[in-house]
Amino acid sequence: MKKERLFTNRQLLTLLWPLIIEQMLEILVGMADTVMVSSVGEAAISGVSLVDMINQLIITLFGALATGGAVVTSQHLGAKRPEDAAKSAGQLVGLGAILGVGVAAFCLITRTAQLRLFFGTITDEVMQACLTYFTITALSFPFLALYNAGAAIFRSTGNSAVSMKVSVIVNGINFCGNALCVFVLKMGVAGVAVPTLISRAVGACIILALAARQDYQLRITPQSVTRFEGRTVKSILYIGIPSAFENSLFQLGRVLVVSMISLFGTVHISANAVANNLDAIGCIVGNAMGLAMITVIGRCIGAQDFEQTNYYTKKLLLWDYIAQGAVNVVVLLFLNQILSMYTLTPETRALAWTLVMIHNGMSIFLWPASFVLPNALRAANDVRFTMVVATASMLVWRMGLSWVLCVQMGMGAVGVWYAMVVDWICRIICFVARFVSGAWKKNAVKKAA
């Protein structure tokens, strides 16, 4: 008798397409931000791009906590324990609130010191842009943490359409606000920061209100959010802390290599910023697939069904290779037309073209196995392995080799991006070997027991 699958193709697509749209909106609005602020000048675009590297480090902290909550909640649902799933959802929101407020306070107090530490060689004009943008966006961190927690709760139930609809509202406010503040009110760098703060606050309020509805299966209540239970919190942090350490160190590594790039001046900083925007387009499907992998594999692990864990991991990886490859090919084919949307000097544009070619060309073959596959391991509680591999690879290749190529050999931004590709290859070798060996199963059994 043929075994019944936990997810049909229709259910997988229902989970995936809202995630893809949500990622697409986030990336496209981010691109629009960069295009708008580029009209203010290259000092402005440099300031925003540098602070966004630090902001991305903070965002990964919130994302790691949300991943921990999503894994635990999905596993409870897979094991047919809805009450425990609802409990973990409430605890996730409470932890998110604490983390968001704490991180915001830390960043506001140390913002000048952080910028001097990471980007001490930048001009005064760029530093002023950094300070303005960092101060305003730091105020939005509590709202972002709460939004991430709420979105993770809905994804755990397979209802990613909710977070997508809220994302449409959030990004709509952000885009319209940017246009108003930059072009009409002439607010400069602050014009792309204030709408970010407002939109994140609105998004957090909406998604938490939806999660608190009486008819929602994982309904959060004031009691579930504020009364922490050691066992549930420990389960969330068991996944969240290694993920936070891994992802935050990864982003810190990105900040440090950008500080290397900043040694080569505004042209390299601006080209790197634009290239990061365009690279993100090629990763839209992959990022969505990574989020879906958490939900799907978490359910399989909760049900202790390792055959279906293998089946869905391979299936989602195949889908990602096909879809992400197609998107990257399109970006490369129309790269010159896309770059023409930015206000760049010829030298900056030429360097941005080279960087995008390196990233998007290689990601067709390397990105899914390097970044989507480890989410399957995380959903199976194999978080320590992914943390060790990702951290070691980042330190040795993304940072160490970047220093050699970028600074010692004078290759600038191009050297950093070559080192990034080597980092991807190392990650793939380790993660594929781990998955194929089946060594991850011992952690899945131990935590589910």
Regions found by a protein language model. Name each.
Residues 4-35, 39-40, 56-68, 72, ...:
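N-terminal transmembrane alpha-helices
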Residues 23-27, 60, 100, 104, ...:
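Residue-level hotspots within the lipid-embedded alpha helices of multi-pass solute transporters
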Residues 66, 136-155, 163-174, 192-207, ...:
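Short runs within selected transmembrane alpha-helices of multi-pass transporters and secretion channels
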Residues 14-33, 136, 170, 199-203, ...:
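Transmembrane helical elements of multi-pass membrane transporters/channels
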Residues 42-53, 130, 134, 193, ...:
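Small-residue hotspots at the loop-to-helix junctions and early N-terminal turns
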Residues 27-46, 115-124, 180-187, 248-281, ...:
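Helix-terminus/linker motif at the lipid-water interface of multi-pass membrane proteins
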